[in-house]
């Protein structure tokens, strides 16, 4: 069985900046996904490179500048993640997700499948809870992650062409 690592990125003391952590917790609380590890990645650290290297599949939730309305959710998969990270619009953290992916790539331990689920923030600043707009996005963000996990785990012969 493949193992999936779900990272929630962000600072929960800065309102919507903690959206990734809140989305990860929502997924863990509302979905039964065996062989899935949930990790509050905070504002990221190079120490997470080992966790990423040991994952077959990786999903990262984060507040991201996706040029959309507050609370909108966008899913980037595999090469789309790489393109988005190269755009420089995404991370407000000291160590970026792009840095961690580069480490995994250089060491030859890039997960087989990976996705970034970005949530457009509304309020960045002090606050121990996300804005109402971003809070309402949690079910949609978690549902997207659960769907990806199920899709990635299906045997190849069960996946219809074009999915």
What feature does the model see in each segment?
Residues 1-112, 116-119, 128-139, 144-163:
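N-terminal catalytic or cofactor-binding beta/alpha core of small enzyme domains
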């Amino acid at each position: 069985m493949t193992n999936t690592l779900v990272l929630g990125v962000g600072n929960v003391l800065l309102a919507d900046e903690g959206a990734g952590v809140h989305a990860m917790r929502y997924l863990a609380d509302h979905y039964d996904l065996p062989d899935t590890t949930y990790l509050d990645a905070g504002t990221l650290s190079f120490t997470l490179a080992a966790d990423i290297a040991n994952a077959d599949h990786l999903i990262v939730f984060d507040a991201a500048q996706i040029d959309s309305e507050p609370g909108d959710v966008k899913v980037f998969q595999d090469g789309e993640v790489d393109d988005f990270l190269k755009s420089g619009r995404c991370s407000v953290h000291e160590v970026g997700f792009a840095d961690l992916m580069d480490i995994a790539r250089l060491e030859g331990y890039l997960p087989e499948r990976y996705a970034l689920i970005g949530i457009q923030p509304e309020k960045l600043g002090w606050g121990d809870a996300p804005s109402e707009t971003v809070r309402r996005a949690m079910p949609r963000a978690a549902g997207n992650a659960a769907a990806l996990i199920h899709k990635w785990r299906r045997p190849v012969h069960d996946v219809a062409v074009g999915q």
